[in-house]
Amino acid sequence: MSLGLYLHIPYCFSKCRYCDFYSRPGERGVPDAYVDALLRELHRFAPDAPLRPDTLYFGGGTPSLLTPAQAERLIRAADPVPGAEITLEANPETVTEESLRGFRAAGVNRISFGVQSARDTQLRTLGRPHSAKQARAAFAAARRAGFENISGDIMLALPHYTQAEFDETLELIEKGGATHISAYLLKIEPDSAFGKHPPEGLPTGDEAADFYLYAVEQLEHHGYRQYEISNFAKPGYEGRHNLIYWDCGDYLGLGPAAHSCMGGKRFCYAPDTAAFLQDAAAPIMDGSCGAEDYLILQLRLRKGLDLDAYKTLYGKQFSTAQLAFVQNCVRAGYATFDGSTLALTPAGLIVQNSILAQLL
């Protein structure tokens, strides 16, 4: 079974207005002491030999605030298996061709740019520190630096959103050479700046659903195959790290607020960088990974839930009433079901929570 390693880099220039992830804004780099703390935790979980993960993911925060030398220290210590996917999330304004060449030489082989929109006015509304021009330059620099596996993020249903804005953003990312695109509906989180002061011009729920379906249609038309609710890829470029999450595989998350699931057990670190640096934030047990997690995560994927595997792994099977509900979903265009695999359509993915409420 594959093992994923997630390294949380909480530092960032500024907090985006929609973000409620744990982060440390106002920083221009990553202290070496923080890298040392991550190395300490790597040794905690793999004291006798390197961890050797199948995927390694630098998430944040803004992981591109790492220096290539810092990234290389962490990659070498983890010692991923040959052919491992090693991803670095990056903000366009934080990278240069030189830094990207450094990350590539350090072992990073997949770069993920947080673009969100091709319109500068929208980027300012979101609190993003980059411009569309910087995003274009970042993609071009990544290609020159030798990256072939490049992902870009798009946010949907933003304030005063239009299909034309999506088209412009897709064009920027596609022309940038992206092999993978993540497209997320804006969600107003209570603890974010938008949660405290919602922006004007937000689409209605029905309008947001229409934007999502339009995005799926256009991405598929441009050769990006949907394989998960929010993720689309050229053939062979699906994100292997996140697939470990969605297939309920083992993953180890290190850093403040990072979550793990190893051997069916969940644990996490407290969202406290100071405590993490001082080795005062040992991981906290947080329940187990069970049948509900498996069903929820598998139904995020376009391949769907294999009912035979569900029964084999967890001894679970749908009741007569649940099977009748599934057939209703099929008739409504929300799902496909061949007797052994239940998969949600794009329309079904929009109402996934309502469907899950009947299946859990």
Regions found by a protein language model. Give the residues of each.
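Immediate flanking context of iron-sulfur cluster ligation sites
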Residues: 1-9
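C-terminal scaffold of the Radical SAM
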Residues: 2, 23-47, 52-316, 337
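Local cysteine-cluster metal-coordination motifs and their immediate loop/turn environment
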Residues: 10-21
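Short amphipathic alpha-helical interaction segments
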Residues: 316-330
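A short, conserved structural fragment
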Residues: 331-340
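Minor-groove-contacting beta-hairpin "wing" of winged helix-turn-helix DNA-binding domains
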Residues: 341-345
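Short, amphipathic alpha-helical interaction segments positioned at domain boundaries
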Residues: 347-360
